[in-house]
């Protein structure tokens, strides 16, 4: 479950409600069409995702998909609606149970203070940016309601492109270091 949070950017409810039908092993994709919602310890399935853009298909690294494929083979029923992640005795996984019995003890053992499951989404976005994905792709795959939100929240992770622009301009115009007398003539029209 941690892998789909960190490497596919799924929200808790999306991961808890993920079914076998949402996993395309051959294309290495996860499709989100519904979520699980917990109210006072009771989990309901088949709920609408957070926003209309939350319904999405996310590319997943093949190394992560191989681990997910092993999980499917060993722990998930063959039915298309079989939940990928379940409670210890089967059935939907409650966030409160997972947090108390699995997540918090693991975080403490790892020595990572105050990280939440949702924090894994932030890691996912950072990984996409580091991999060179553009803001539109990041926004779409994270299920954000707009590119503007992605830029507001994560804009500092994206390179602004200025260094690349300088390199392209130097390639076009020259950097002036070889012959200072070699000046590109700019012609203008008389605007009178």
Where on the chain are the PLM-derived regions?
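Short, charged phosphate-coordinating catalytic segments
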Residues: 5-36, 136
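Short, basic (Lys/Arg/His-rich) helix/loop patches that form interaction surfaces
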Residues: 8, 58, 66, 70-96, ...
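Structural detector for helix-capping/boundary residues
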Residues: 18-21, 101, 123, 152
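Short, polar N-cap/turn motifs at the start of nucleic acid-interacting alpha helices
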Residues: 22-29, 114, 133-155
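C-terminal secondary-structure termini that scaffold catalytic or DNA-interacting sites
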Residues: 27, 36-64, 77, 88-91, ...
């Amino acid at each position: 479950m941690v892998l789909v949070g960190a490497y596919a950017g799924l929200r808790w409810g999306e991961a808890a409600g993920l079914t076998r039908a949402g996993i395309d092993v051959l294309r290495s994709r996860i499709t989100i069409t519904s979520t699980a919602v917990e109210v006072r310890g009771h989990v309901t399935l088949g709920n609408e995702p957070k926003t209309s853009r939350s319904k999405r298909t996310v590319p997943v690294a093949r190394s992560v998909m191989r681990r997910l494929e092993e999980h499917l083979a060993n722990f998930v029923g063959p039915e298309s609606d079989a939940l990928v992640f379940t409670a210890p005795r089967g059935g939907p996984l409650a966030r409160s149970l997972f947090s108390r019995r699995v997540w918090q003890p693991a975080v403490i053992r790892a020595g990572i203070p105050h990280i939440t499951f949702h924090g894994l989404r932030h890691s996912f976005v950072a990984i996409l940016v580091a991999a060179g994905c553009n803001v539109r792709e990041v926004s779409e795959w994270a299920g954000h309601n707009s590119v503007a939100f992605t830029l507001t929240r994560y804009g500092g992770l994206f390179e602004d492109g200025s260094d690349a622009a300088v390199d392209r301009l130097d390639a076009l115009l020259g950097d002036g270091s070889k012959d200072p007398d070699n000046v590109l003539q700019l012609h203008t029209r008389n605007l009178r």
